[in-house]
């Protein structure tokens, strides 16, 4: 009978023992029982290894002969005398008893669900009320509107918008400044306060407010030099405001060195603008009110939007009105004052940005499934205004905005809209750098975050996406290292998106991270700070927390069922395998309550596949593997009398499960699908036999041969077909192969699984005699290539495969149920995260444990 080499056995056991005897690995020690015993003759020492699964057969490895024997724990009777390998994997971190003790009130009480239902209705109302944008008042912009003059009948000037002046008079804070009381940013407060003091001084009113405001400015102006960051275009706008304040006789410390330095910087930038008077840089239009002395007011009118605004900025629009008397500017500002009750925001309209941001916010929080119709309406609206030039904050924005465009590209593509990444080319300067590279402020940082996230969805050969990634990733990593912004929430988001890009971001893990860092009093910054109530929303946060906990309670019940099944089936007693119920369950990456049957079937089948993988790799002989495979092909349990009893038990458990799941499939699909179900299992075990024959012959296949076989033996075929047939959607016979094997998307996801796995397991497999891996096969095809060369090549192949899989996933296919496509496509996530640093299935480490704890074990505080 064919045997693995003695040296391979020793190497494998040496590798396994390293995990057990490593003094730094206390968990591994405590979860393994290792005993040295003597035979009755006193001549042979035997090492006995048992996993954490409990009672069951023990594999005994003789130190003198290298052979192993399966013995009964209770009688120590030798069952066979065949050399076998024993894989000393780390023990199960989520033992049956741990899972069974989980309790949560969110499953038992209807109060939580009733409150969640109420919140869903309220948030739907918020979607339905979306208009041109809901945004907080801006003292800075309102003061600009208050400064606009008109000529009265006696020839004297008076405020054209007295309601704006009254708002400035009545909204000074206790410390003498103007701004959002709950959030202090020095740049924001100074811009708001200086301009408010100017507005009051122009009309010679509010003398006490002017005095208090000037006192605040004088006290804080000296601190400006200590600021780590300045708001966008501060160096253009603020010196111009100080010049106006000085002309009005407002007593301030104008000669501070830092103020002089700001003025010098402004003069240099004005020189650049003057030299390009016929072509003012678009990114400087936002600071138009700081450029008064160099603007040609006739030529500037070509930048006016349909709604009458200039770059959606009331301040800039008021400045143009002051210098031109344009009626469209007047009408817009008058309408804004009516809408916002005597004040104006820092930008308007923001209908596109608000819709995209709300959808993005809802989906980040993990509650998007409650608002499918509302999301579609919002995105249909955005898509109607989508342009190859890009989009701005509002539908009438004349100048596209990188942040809104990148967010739109990502969100629209995610939902299946046809949008080209070439739109990003509009945001590069002559050096190929994106506009957001200028300024180094967190407004630009937000743009780069969305640029990076958009690049996650790259298709093959999309140069614009590749350029975006090359620019955005180092930019964000540098931002994390240098802390160029004080925005804590934004940094937490950057840490997550860089650490877990889209192809690695498990939906529930992302939701947990976003909820934990969510700030329902969050402010954004343009020239000044502002709030968007639809985004910084306590109702969204409350629903997200409740929904997460309610769904988690269902997941806990499913995990209890699954660990109980694993134990009662006897599989927990099999000691040659890894016990990974919680990890396999996590791998489904499908959390919606309606897919409970899918998750349960996937996990049961997946756990058995982990067992089969270990059985084929380290336990079964070639002949036993062939017998087992023949039983699978014939769908017959009577062919198993020549294989060990533990393998017979595994087969019977598998066979029973197949019958049970097929019965469930019949109920959903309305017909017997067994013929479809058997095919991937036959392919799967045939590949195991092929791999073992190559191993026994010492043959390393070519890279192409390797992929054809090993991409199947990774096991996605058998473990996904029945689950997708249980998703509640009818899958026609001819559609099965379009979504499952051998569809392009399925093969690409399988390829990414196989090769990503190889990069973290090949050394361990090589040590136990399994020479064939993607790394080894590439090196065989390319003499002289190093392991490092092979890994780099494999990473490129995986990157390409994921891009092609994305293209296949988003490609329109009306006959394929979207739920089925999503289930297959989302399986790419778990392999990327499980094999990010180590073999996350073979070594049940603390990082994986932390993922599972966050998603399934620990509820969110409500």
From Swiss-Prot:
Pfam families: Terpene_synth, Terpene_synth_C. Keywords: Lyase, Magnesium, Metal-binding, Taxol biosynthesis. Mg(2+) 1 binds at residues 613, 617. GO terms for biological process: paclitaxel biosynthetic process. It is an enzyme of class 4 (lyase). It comes from the Eukaryota. Binds 3 Mg(2+) ions per subunit. Its cofactor is Mg(2+). Its EC number is 4.2.3.17. Mg(2+) 2 binds at residues 613, 617. It catalyses: (2E,6E,10E)-geranylgeranyl diphosphate = taxa-4(5),11(12)-diene + diphosphate. Coiled coil: none annotated. Mg(2+) 3 binds at residues 757, 761, 765. SUPFAM superfamilies: Terpenoid cyclases/Protein prenyltransferases (SSF48239), Terpenoid synthases (SSF48576). GO terms for molecular function: magnesium ion binding; taxadiene synthase activity; terpene synthase activity. A motif (DDXXD motif) lies at residues 613-617. PANTHER family: (E,E)-GERANYLLINALOOL SYNTHASE, ENT-COPALYL DIPHOSPHATE SYNTHASE, CHLOROPLASTIC. The Asp-Asp-Xaa-Xaa-Asp/Glu (DDXXD/E) motif is important for the catalytic activity, presumably through binding to Mg(2+). Catalyzes the cyclization of the ubiquitous isoprenoid intermediate geranylgeranyl diphosphate to taxa-4,11-diene, the parent olefin with a taxane skeleton. Belongs to the terpene synthase family. This is Taxadiene synthase.
